[in-house]
Amino acid sequence: MAQQIVQSLQDEGTQSLKLDFSMKYVLGYRSDFKNNIFQYTMNDQNRIIYPAGNTIVISNNENKQQFINCIPGTKGITCMTLSPSKRLLAWSEDCDSGIIVVFDLIKLDKLEKAKNQNYQEPSDKDKLDKQAEKDRRDRFEKEKREKIDKLQKEVKRIITTLDCKSRHYVALDFNKINEKRIVALSCAPDWQLIYFQLDKQKTVIINQVPLKVGDNMRYTHCFFHPKEEDFIVAIGTGAIKPYKLGADGQFKQKDPPFVKKESKDQAHSPNYLSYCILQDGYMVIGTDMGEILLFQPSCEFKTILASSPKNEQFAIQCIQPYSKGFLVGGKECTILFYEKDVDLKNPYKLCSKKIQFRDMKAMITSLLLTPNEEKLIVGVDSGQLLQVPFTSDSMQLNEENSKCEPLFMPFHSDKITGLDVCIRKSLVATCSVDKTVRIWNYSDNQLENSKEFEEEAYAVAFHPSGFHIIVAFTEKIRLMNIFENDLISFKELSVKNCREIQFSNGGHFFAITNVSMVQVFQFYTGENPSNLVFRGSGKVRTIFWEEDDQGFYTGSTDGLVIYWRVDDNGPQKTQIAQFNNLIITSITGLYNPDTTTQGLERILFVSGVSSSQENEGEKCVYKLVISCRQDKEGREITDNTLKKIYYVSQPEQKIFTGTNVSQIAISHSKKLFFFATEDRPGAIRITKYPFTNEIMEIQSHFGPITRMRISFKDNYIFTAGEDGALIIYENKEKEYQVKIENESVEAAAEEFLIPRDQYNDQKREIEKLKRQLNEERMKQEQQIKEKMKDRDDKINQLENQQKDSDNRDLNKYQLLEREKNEMIESYEEKKRMMKLQHENNKRTIENEYKKKIALEMSRNEELAREKEKEEKRFQSEIQQYQEEHLRQMEEKRRHYEEQLAIEKQLYNDLHLKREELAYKFDQKRNKLEMEAEELIDQLKEENESKMQVLFKNLEKAEIKKMDRRNDYDTEAQKLEEQKSKLKGTMEDITSIQETNKMLQKEKESHAKEIDEREKTIRDKGRRIYELKKKTQELEKFKFVLDYKIKELKRDIGPKEEEIAKMKEQIANMNSEILHFKRTNANLKLIVTDLRLRQEGMKKEIEDQSKVIQQNNQYIKAFEQDMSDCHQHIADYKKLKQKVLNLYNQYVQGDDSKKKRLENNDQQKEIMKERAHLETSVNNLKIKHDKNQSVHKSDTTIIMKHNTFLIFEINHLKREKKKILEDKAKMLMQATQKKKQDGTSRVDIDSLEKEIQKNEDEKRKLKEDIEKLRQYNDQIKNQLRQQIQNQQDDDEDN
């Protein structure tokens, strides 16, 4: 038993590997959930947020990306949302208990700035000694780490609750007012609305969303009201549920929004796919059938927009608001525009223009409009991100300015099946099930080349030169040249179902798989020598070439690892190992550097997926040490060389991973080992080689990883998965990269292939442009010289003009200076005069003001004395009024207490009467129900017994009818056979008559010849005698045939009578069946009438119960109003007002209420009578329709009989005509034969008798037809009479 050396990579002793290794770029987009594209913060409109793989990507126009990774151990993002201020990003992840992650984007920017902050070296003036410089640097690094740790804790918050039994949430939304609360909708099985407080990180409210059992209800969205933070709405397939936060802290469901919907025009599909809250507070919801539902801000249904694309069944997947209305996205990459309208019934109208991407037929799942409304970003379900120029004016839209283009570059839309990296160039090639092959530049993060084919591509391989690739398709393999903008095939190999292609390290060979067979082709010739066709067992899944290209290893689905030699220095096939219940998916290896023997040891690593549950716990990677030795016994005679034999020199080692591994690889520097997982989510694990207990894991793919490759310098790693994403990782550790001494080799090659015609065209174009450039230079130099001359002339002219203008300005300045001095002197004189005038006016105004002040002071003293007198009088009046008010209040209180006692006594009496009436009513209602149930049960039993008897009779009649019909069919078949025989005999007779005619002609010719030639009379006479004998024999044969015809007619006669009798019996049976059906229909109508009466009684009972409830509410309202009056017993005015209200409400309104109740009773009686009349009318309509159908079936039967009779009459007419023609011909023949034969007369007599007989039969048939017509008329009259009687009965009813 082989010794197992267990090296576990998942035990408790593992540590995190510290390595500068991270994702550089993600080429892909996840479109499996909707509304997942967001704009970054308001200040930065160039960055877009979207999910790709198992991460969230923040990408900008400069082709750079930031990544927000998911929590390790979860299974991917399920929904996303962004706060209104675009600061907080929240998403949910799939795990055992639902997880919500809230991410602060502003602090993310601060974190990036802190990470990029570097230590600034001091200037020459501030130079310190080495120790102080070191302390300062250490202090800076410590502060930087503390700041980064603090921001990392603040930037991401994880929210979860144990009350959630779901694995994930399907919808999230932030509170629109302060963004401190978030609502989440969990999926099956519990469907909960959970309300979180972000500042405290706790669950505030949990409310179970009711889900009807048996319905296909599924909630997909939840959101806050934009202006009310306690109003939440949940929508989905089959439901719209609004909730309001109650005073008790729990959500209470409001009325459904469709309660008031009564019109049939408002019927719509219940599958709500998308929603949008518009700027005016209205809500728009789209359905799968194209209806756009408009809701008021209170979540009350208003209308279905008349311009909804419901006739096209345009499933509305997403809705995006904009300044003039909203956009609608759906199938076939079509975006519709809706703008605000003045019509109150339909406030939004559909614009005539729309955006449609004609080249794509995918479904739009996400829409994002930039804040300045200049660009529209579209996400489609084929995994593509598109952009289109946008304008809010729909009239400016046309095909030119609405052309779409990829936002960054086209991605794969389905599972990536092939991946390979180029050695000489920074290129990586991928192929996918979406029938495309793409070549990416991983240094510039650009798509270099792409081509779409008609078949799915399963594998791709890059030639080491970087000029060629090989792609495996469903039916063939194509060898292609890589041109600047195209991939052109130069050879095709007809190999089917190839799933793996690998170039040798030198590029002169490439190996392909063909189920269990591996074929090695010479690349430069495209030949496959017979000695390079290797056959194994099981499907080959992976190929690994040795470094010297002398052979390669293969792994298959049956767990076999086989080494195949390409040269002749050993056995062509060597089985290295076999692993039971293992599907091998990847092999890698290296030469053992510790080997000291002559032969080099090879270390091989094998990974795969367990094919049985027995080995499910043993998930590991196998390590094999392979050695070679020389086979001295099997020495080659031709060249005296020794063959090499390969064998496993050490026991296999197991490297436990804890998960299925799909791909493994070792770096070219032999210092790092990479694992790619098969499980979801797809993760890449890195560990040092030789193996240690340090591991680094990045869960980057949403689905399993299908391919993994490493660049030649080990600075980049590439993975591709089933989620259609290609992820580029960057290794910045120089220690773990390949060290290349020659610096010229480090630069990637930039050569590319170009067709010779294109090269010549470009060369000619370059020469032409050079000539044009020289000509343009000459022209420009000449133009510059001329311009310089013109410029100098203009400068001189301007200088002269400037001198003249300076002289004129100087003269003007001197003149203005003199005027200024004169004006200053005049203003000084005016100022002195105004000061004197102001002093005189001031003295006069002060004297007048002092006089007015003295008068006002004396007047104020008089008013104060009057005020004291008025206050004393007012106090005495207030005291008198208070005493009077208290006396009146006491009297009224006593009066109202007496009235209250009387009212209470009346109330008690009314309460007792009500209880007595309710008791009597319950007794009567129970008695009526018992009687009605007994009567219904009795009628049910009688009807069921009658129905059973009728069904039994019907079954017996059906059986008899089928038997008679079978007999009729057999007899009709026999009759047809006899008619066909008779037709054959008549054809024989006609052929004989034709031969007879020919003989008659010959006879006449012979008679003429007798008259003309006397020499041949004897010979002709003999011939005439022979011909006579022949005619006699033919006449006898004719007689025999006539006799047979008569016998056949005798046999047909009784059979036709039997057929007629059977027809009559079938008609009678059909009439009986119709009678049974009518009786059955009448019984059904009686049953339905009884059921309708029962429903009417139930409605009466419900109406009575409603009346009782109304009376109870009336009494309770009175009690409530009385208690309100009692509260104001101390306040006289309020008490008076309340009592007056009670009197007006309950005393004066009694008569009107009684009249209203009486009117309601009369209306109820009228409604009952109307319902009874409507049911009777419906029953009469059903009877009439049934009678019409019976009458129609009878008339069709009669028409069929008539057509049959007309057919028989026409047939007899044709026979009569034919017989008359035959009779005329026979008479002509008889007159010609009278002279030669006496027997012809007898034949003519027999023919005349036969004709007479046919005439008699024809007359009888006419009589039978006339009788049948009379019978049909009688049936029609009877049916008309029955219909008239039924109509009379219905009118009487």
UniProtKB/Swiss-Prot annotation:
<feature type="repeat" description="WD 4">
    <location>
        <begin position="411"/>
        <end position="450"/>
    </location>
</feature>
<dbReference type="Pfam" id="PF00400">
    <property type="entry name" value="WD40"/>
</dbReference>
<keyword id="KW-0677">Repeat</keyword>
<protein>
    <recommendedName>
        <fullName>Cilia- and flagella-associated protein 57 A</fullName>
    </recommendedName>
</protein>
<feature type="repeat" description="WD 5">
    <location>
        <begin position="535"/>
        <end position="574"/>
    </location>
</feature>
<keyword id="KW-0853">WD repeat</keyword>
<dbReference type="InterPro" id="IPR036322">
    <property type="entry name" value="WD40_repeat_dom_sf"/>
</dbReference>
<comment type="function">
    <text>Associates with components of the nexin-dynein regulatory complex (N-DRC), a key regulator of ciliary/flagellar motility, and might act as an inner dynein arm (IDA) hub or linkage.</text>
</comment>
<comment type="subunit">
    <text>Forms a heterodimer with CFAP57C. Associates with components of the nexin-dynein regulatory complex (N-DRC) and the CFAP184:CFAP263 complex.</text>
</comment>
<keyword id="KW-0175">Coiled coil</keyword>
<dbReference type="InterPro" id="IPR015943">
    <property type="entry name" value="WD40/YVTN_repeat-like_dom_sf"/>
</dbReference>
<feature type="repeat" description="WD 1">
    <location>
        <begin position="72"/>
        <end position="113"/>
    </location>
</feature>
<feature type="coiled-coil region">
    <location>
        <begin position="1045"/>
        <end position="1079"/>
    </location>
</feature>
<dbReference type="GO" id="GO:0005929">
    <property type="term" value="C:cilium"/>
</dbReference>
<comment type="similarity">
    <text>Belongs to the CFAP57 family.</text>
</comment>
<feature type="region of interest" description="Disordered">
    <location>
        <begin position="117"/>
        <end position="143"/>
    </location>
</feature>
<feature type="repeat" description="WD 3">
    <location>
        <begin position="359"/>
        <end position="398"/>
    </location>
</feature>
<dbReference type="InterPro" id="IPR001680">
    <property type="entry name" value="WD40_rpt"/>
</dbReference>
<dbReference type="InterPro" id="IPR052993">
    <property type="entry name" value="CFA-57"/>
</dbReference>
<feature type="coiled-coil region">
    <location>
        <begin position="1209"/>
        <end position="1285"/>
    </location>
</feature>
<feature type="repeat" description="WD 2">
    <location>
        <begin position="309"/>
        <end position="348"/>
    </location>
</feature>
<feature type="coiled-coil region">
    <location>
        <begin position="756"/>
        <end position="1016"/>
    </location>
</feature>
<keyword id="KW-0966">Cell projection</keyword>
<feature type="repeat" description="WD 6">
    <location>
        <begin position="700"/>
        <end position="739"/>
    </location>
</feature>
<feature type="compositionally biased region" description="Basic and acidic residues">
    <location>
        <begin position="122"/>
        <end position="143"/>
    </location>
</feature>
